[in-house]
Amino acid sequence: MTHTIAGEPVSSPNNGKTLRILQLYPKDMNIYGDWGNTLALARRAHAHGFDVEILDYNPGDTFPDDVDIIIGGGGQDSGQTVIQEDLHAIGAKLKKNAEDGMPMLVICGLYQLFGKEFRTHEGETLKGINIVDAYTVGGNERLIGNIVEDSQEFGTIVGFENHSGLTYLGAGCEPLATVTKGVGNNSTDHHEGARVHNVVGTYLHGSLLPKNPKISDYLIEAAAQRKYGEFTPEKIDDSMVEKARASAMKRPR
């Protein structure tokens, strides 16, 4: 399935190479603008010369075998419950793809379920698929507000967090970044998100990728190298992005 954005086809001839982006559970895990990550990534890949196909996957669908990047968003606890059985049905495929180097971006609720488990505030335990060495505990208050963080890989990352889950990383992964404004994974260690293989997990909504093109470029490069063995980036004018980032960093919490 090829989507269009703003009336223009995402897929148009350029370098003759195609990247296929899969959006996980858009019906149940698409909140706070997370679908914008897929749209921004498609646009960015197109700017780098790729044809792009965007595919949806919802519970009960046949999981496609020939995708290059996987994106998953956040949702309410009820949405996590709805998808849990199906997520475990495809969990082995997702884990193998992650271990094989497929780039993935998972936000908030799916970030939690890519870990070992999520213990909800109501006492229910939702088992994760154990791609990320982390567990999450439901907190008593929501952590809401603008967030700024520093990453060794991506520089300054800006976004918006809105979660009550408190996530704690194990030794098998690294944090995505260190929080300079906001809370992040939990209220104690100043870490935010997680990195393992080519998987990026984070609590940042907003959407994340329009304001953080370095992460988009990372996902695109990883996918291109994995599929074609090479990546030649185009020079992209990010002047408007930099203005948006500067504005976001000045916003109050």
Whereabouts are the PLM-identified features?
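N-terminal beta1-alpha1 cap of cysteine-dependent amidohydrolase-like domains
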Residues: M1-E99, P210-R253
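Beta-strand-turn-beta hairpins that frame and shape the catalytic cleft
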Residues: K17-L19, Q152-I157, R195-V200
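Conserved beta-strand scaffold positions in the cores of enzyme catalytic domains, especially
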Residues: Q23, I54, I131, G159-E161, ...
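Glycine-rich beta-alpha junction loops
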Residues: Y25-K27, S164-L166, G206-L208
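Structural motif
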Residues: I69-G73, L105, G201-Y203
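Cysteine-nucleophile active-site neighborhood
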Residues: D77-E153
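Pocket-forming structural segment of enzyme catalytic cores
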Residues: H121-E192
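A glycine-centered loop/beta-turn motif at secondary-structure junctions
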Residues: N186-A224
